[in-house]
Amino acid sequence: MYWYISFLRPPPVSVTISSESLLVTPQVANDLRTELRYEPTKIYYTWQRIAPKSSEPETLKELTTFMPPASTYKPLAIPLSLQAQVEDSWRLGLFSCRSRSENCKDAEPEPINHLLDLVQQPKILGVWSEGIEIIRLPGGMKNGAVRGMGKQKERPEDAGRCARAKKSKEKEKERYDVPKQGRIHRELILPLVRQDQQPSLKIIEQTSFDLDKKVWDSGLALSAWLHEHLSDSMTLPPLGQRILSLLTQKERLKVIELGSGTGLVSIALSLAHPNQSTSRWDITATDLESAMPLMNENLVLNSLGIVHLDHVVDDTISSRLSVDAKVLDWDRPLPNWVAEDPPQLVIAADVTYNTSAFPSLLSTLSSLICPPNDSNARPLLLMAYKERDSGERELWQMLKGQGIDMVKIDEVKGCEDYGFTEIWVGGTDLS
């Protein structure tokens, strides 16, 4: 498993220029926020302007050491950037150490996470807020005023009374009235794709309890695993090399992802494409209708999606890569577009958490992996699995009953060497 920094109390949508700080409650927990990290975790904060003109993140400053239960619900005041101006938009980042050293003495913290760290030396994942708008109170400071500067002079006899009243009112508003953000951003630096570009993978999550709108461990592990082995598959067993040979073949490749949620794995795979040959990839991320808006937003955020790719600068990449999001409901027969363009590879991560959905999942997988007798297609299944309940493994026997064999080819260690994610290959002909 991995550890994620997130906001139990998120930052506000906006803050006044006269504010000295804003309140958040950070937490360090697992992917579904059901288990807190009961080890001292130093958390650092940074600010980055994102509008009207973006800036580099500011130097990280220590915020707190997260240690439940004392830290679980504790609100913390974070000073605003001294560079903040009215009509700016700034995002807040929370990060921990680069290394697994809990006291951070071995490495300086940085406001970044690397995707390959998740398979090499897992670290605590940082988080970015959405943009926080810097506003002024009605009748307050002028546009362009920098926090702490340009205040109107007050008469000495009124200064103390006004200051106390204003401070009290602002605290009251901050605690009770200010709308809070409902989304967070994760960013992961990818391996060098081209000499002039080192891109990042960007994912928006919602802070609600919607499971299809969060990043899950197995999705991260499979994304990192793909990027690690697409450049070198020789350390994998034959079935693993067979999967990677599909991804590096010269012929066109059709990929369907099941239960894509945020679109993480499809996006990660798509961003690995420039490393490959001149083959064409057509990738379709699927889920229920409720997941489509966020999934499409994440595709666009990463300069993917059919509409966006038609307008990218690099025409070579756009001609070799198609990525889209479509509805695929496991409770219904496969849509016509699947039969019209059947996949050669089906990928899935964290699709086994709901055992009551196994009959529907089994039906969908069987329809994809075991095509009609008149079809020459024999797709392979690449699945990342993290055990959350031992009963989930019943799916393997259910698949075998449908003629689909499953073979484990690798494991990805979690943070602090526990909570493995297993990498499996499935198919009707694995010999």
Could you say what each language-model-derived stretch is?
Residues 1-431:
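S-adenosylmethionine-dependent methyltransferases
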